[in-house]
Protein backbone atom coordinates (compact mmCIF):
# COMPACT_ATOMS: atom_id res chain seq x y z
CA UNK A 1 0.00 0.00 0.00
CA UNK A 2 1.37 3.40 -0.99
CA UNK A 3 1.09 6.46 1.19
CA UNK A 4 0.46 10.03 0.08
CA UNK A 5 4.15 10.91 -0.22
CA UNK A 6 4.89 7.80 -2.29
CA UNK A 7 2.04 8.70 -4.66
CA UNK A 8 3.29 12.32 -4.84
CA UNK A 9 6.85 11.17 -5.68
CA UNK A 10 5.59 8.67 -8.29
CA UNK A 11 3.53 11.35 -10.08
CA UNK A 12 6.72 13.37 -10.50
CA UNK A 13 8.73 10.40 -11.79
CA UNK A 14 10.99 10.18 -8.73
CA UNK A 15 12.33 6.65 -8.27
CA UNK A 16 11.63 5.10 -4.88
CA UNK A 17 10.12 1.99 -3.30
CA UNK A 18 7.34 2.04 -0.74
CA UNK A 19 8.06 -0.15 2.29
CA UNK A 20 4.61 0.39 3.78
CA UNK A 21 3.95 1.88 7.20
CA UNK A 22 5.52 1.30 10.60
CA UNK A 23 3.59 0.54 13.80
CA UNK A 24 2.82 4.26 14.29
CA UNK A 25 1.46 4.66 10.78
CA UNK A 26 4.54 6.51 9.49
CA UNK A 27 5.20 5.94 5.80
CA UNK A 28 8.55 4.29 5.04
CA UNK A 29 10.30 4.69 1.69
CA UNK A 30 13.45 3.19 0.21
CA UNK A 31 15.62 5.48 -1.91
CA UNK A 32 18.69 4.45 -3.94
CA UNK A 33 21.95 6.10 -2.82
CA UNK A 34 22.45 7.79 -6.21
CA UNK A 35 18.98 9.39 -5.99
CA UNK A 36 19.05 10.31 -2.30
CA UNK A 37 20.53 13.83 -2.43
CA UNK A 38 18.18 15.14 -5.12
CA UNK A 39 15.13 13.59 -3.44
CA UNK A 40 16.26 15.03 -0.08
CA UNK A 41 16.31 18.53 -1.58
CA UNK A 42 12.87 17.96 -3.10
CA UNK A 43 11.49 16.75 0.26
CA UNK A 44 12.92 19.82 1.99
CA UNK A 45 11.30 22.14 -0.54
CA UNK A 46 8.06 20.13 -0.24
CA UNK A 47 8.01 20.99 3.47
CA UNK A 48 9.98 18.31 5.32
CA UNK A 49 12.03 20.98 7.06
CA UNK A 50 13.07 19.04 10.17
CA UNK A 51 15.33 16.00 10.35
CA UNK A 52 14.25 14.37 13.59
CA UNK A 53 16.96 11.72 13.56
CA UNK A 54 19.37 9.82 11.39
CA UNK A 55 20.73 6.42 12.32
CA UNK A 56 22.26 3.42 10.61
CA UNK A 57 22.25 -0.31 11.09
CA UNK A 58 23.72 -3.51 9.71
CA UNK A 59 20.97 -5.48 7.97
CA UNK A 60 22.73 -8.88 8.16
CA UNK A 61 26.26 -10.27 8.49
CA UNK A 62 27.88 -9.78 5.11
CA UNK A 63 24.76 -8.03 3.83
CA UNK A 64 23.72 -4.45 3.26
CA UNK A 65 24.10 -1.44 5.54
CA UNK A 66 21.18 0.96 5.96
CA UNK A 67 21.05 4.66 6.73
CA UNK A 68 17.66 5.75 8.11
CA UNK A 69 16.29 9.30 8.12
CA UNK A 70 13.19 10.39 10.07
CA UNK A 71 11.82 13.59 8.53
CA UNK A 72 9.05 15.81 9.86
CA UNK A 73 6.97 18.43 8.10
CA UNK A 74 6.45 21.19 10.67
CA UNK A 75 3.87 23.82 9.76
CA UNK A 76 2.37 26.65 11.76
CA UNK A 77 -1.11 25.87 13.04
CA UNK A 78 -0.89 22.12 12.36
CA UNK A 79 -1.22 20.04 15.52
CA UNK A 80 -0.15 16.69 14.06
CA UNK A 81 3.05 17.01 12.05
CA UNK A 82 3.44 14.79 8.98
CA UNK A 83 6.36 12.35 9.20
CA UNK A 84 8.19 10.03 6.84
CA UNK A 85 10.97 7.49 7.28
CA UNK A 86 13.54 7.17 4.48
CA UNK A 87 15.86 4.16 4.22
CA UNK A 88 18.94 4.21 2.00
CA UNK A 89 20.71 0.86 1.60
CA UNK A 90 24.34 0.48 0.51
CA UNK A 91 26.76 -2.40 -0.03
CA UNK A 92 29.21 -3.01 2.81
CA UNK A 93 32.15 -3.48 0.40
CA UNK A 94 32.05 0.23 -0.51
CA UNK A 95 29.42 1.91 1.70
CA UNK A 96 28.85 5.37 0.25
CA UNK A 97 25.77 7.57 0.60
CA UNK A 98 25.47 11.26 -0.29
CA UNK A 99 25.47 13.45 2.81
CA UNK A 100 22.42 15.61 3.43
CA UNK A 101 24.33 17.94 5.77
CA UNK A 102 23.78 20.85 3.38
CA UNK A 103 20.01 20.19 3.42
CA UNK A 104 19.52 19.53 7.15
CA UNK A 105 22.43 20.75 9.30
CA UNK A 106 21.20 18.61 12.21
CA UNK A 107 22.56 15.51 10.49
CA UNK A 108 26.16 16.60 11.19
CA UNK A 109 26.90 14.51 14.29
CA UNK A 110 24.43 11.78 13.35
CA UNK A 111 26.15 10.98 10.04
CA UNK A 112 29.50 11.11 11.82
CA UNK A 113 28.28 8.55 14.36
CA UNK A 114 27.04 6.26 11.56
CA UNK A 115 30.44 6.58 9.91
CA UNK A 116 32.25 5.87 13.18
CA UNK A 117 30.19 2.81 14.14
CA UNK A 118 29.42 1.24 10.74
CA UNK A 119 31.88 2.75 8.27
CA UNK A 120 29.33 4.37 5.97
CA UNK A 121 31.03 7.20 4.07
CA UNK A 122 28.77 10.21 3.60
CA UNK A 123 30.01 11.97 0.46
CA UNK A 124 30.42 15.76 0.73
CA UNK A 125 30.11 15.79 4.53
CA UNK A 126 32.38 18.64 5.70
CA UNK A 127 33.80 16.97 8.84
CA UNK A 128 33.47 13.21 8.38
CA UNK A 129 35.72 11.69 11.01
CA UNK A 130 35.36 9.50 14.08
CA UNK A 131 33.26 11.02 16.84
CA UNK A 132 33.02 8.32 19.54
CA UNK A 133 35.97 6.00 18.95
CA UNK A 134 39.63 7.06 18.95
CA UNK A 135 41.05 7.89 15.52
CA UNK A 136 43.41 4.91 15.90
CA UNK A 137 40.53 2.42 16.28
CA UNK A 138 40.48 -0.27 13.61
CA UNK A 139 37.15 -1.50 12.28
CA UNK A 140 33.48 -0.64 12.64
CA UNK A 141 32.12 -1.78 16.05
CA UNK A 142 28.40 -2.03 15.19
CA UNK A 143 28.82 -4.21 12.13
CA UNK A 144 27.55 -7.72 12.74
CA UNK A 145 30.75 -9.23 11.34
CA UNK A 146 33.00 -7.09 13.58
CA UNK A 147 35.47 -9.03 15.70
CA UNK A 148 36.21 -7.20 18.95
CA UNK A 149 39.88 -6.92 19.89
CA UNK A 150 40.98 -8.88 22.96
CA UNK A 151 42.44 -5.82 24.61
CA UNK A 152 42.29 -2.11 24.07
CA UNK A 153 43.94 0.26 26.51
CA UNK A 154 42.13 3.50 27.18
CA UNK A 155 44.81 6.09 27.59
CA UNK A 156 44.40 9.32 29.52
CA UNK A 157 41.06 8.23 30.94
CA UNK A 158 41.47 10.34 34.05
From Swiss-Prot:
Keywords: Chloroplast, Membrane, NAD, NADP, Plastid, Plastoquinone, Quinone, Thylakoid, Translocase, Transport. One of its GO terms (cellular component) is chloroplast thylakoid membrane. PROSITE patterns: COMPLEX1_30K. Pfam families: Complex1_30kDa (PF00329). It is found in: Plastid, Chloroplast thylakoid membrane. Transmembrane segments: none annotated. It comes from the Eukaryota. It is a peripheral membrane protein. Its EC number is 7.1.1.-. Its main location: plastid. It catalyses: a plastoquinone + NADH + (n+1) H(+)(in) = a plastoquinol + NAD(+) + n H(+)(out); a plastoquinone + NADPH + (n+1) H(+)(in) = a plastoquinol + NADP(+) + n H(+)(out). GO terms for molecular function: NADH dehydrogenase (ubiquinone) activity; quinone binding. Gene3D superfamilies: NADH:ubiquinone oxidoreductase, 30kDa subunit. GO terms for biological process: photosynthesis, light reaction. NDH shuttles electrons from NAD(P)H:plastoquinone, via FMN and iron-sulfur (Fe-S) centers, to quinones in the photosynthetic chain and possibly in a chloroplast respiratory chain. The immediate electron acceptor for the enzyme in this species is believed to be plastoquinone. Couples the redox reaction to proton translocation, and thus conserves the redox energy in a proton gradient. NCBIfam families: PRK12494.1 (NF009141). NDH is composed of at least 16 different subunits, 5 of which are encoded in the nucleus. Belongs to the complex I 30 kDa subunit family. This is NAD(P)H-quinone oxidoreductase subunit J, chloroplastic.
